[in-house]
Amino acid sequence: MNEYSSTKTFEGYSTAFRQWKAKHSHCQYLHGYAMKFKVTFIGDLDELNWVCDFGSFKRNGIKEHMSHMFDHTTIVAKDDPKLSTFKQLSEEKLIQLRVLDGVGCEKFATYVYNYINNIILKETKARVKVLTVECFEGGTNNSAIYKPIQALNNVDKSISH
């Protein structure tokens, strides 16, 4: 078995959120970024010599779900003390609210990893998996990479051979 990797970028999502626990920082206030995600897939090639058929993302709902979660949305942590206020804004059609375990590049990268990896593993019968997800806040701001420990161990083994 040979392992190849390929990368798909999802970008152009206008997303607002706040780090409510960051009382020492302006990040505690609602603010937004043009979010971008770089998803790296790893696995054997298929009969078309592709690691991953990116065209399938329309059919399997990945493209639509990414847009639903991150395009012109306000994402709030489920433990945000102002969650009820955000829910009211959503009910009044002032925001498109999404609630996640946490917010920020690290949490968004983890969410995207879990969502896409579950679909890809099923669709390819585990021939392909997500290796990493890198989430960018805007064009020049920071990014965070999510890579599960198991994936790190597999990469380390493949490098040492």
Where are each of the predicted segments found?
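Charge-rich, low-complexity N-terminal segments
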Residues: 1-161
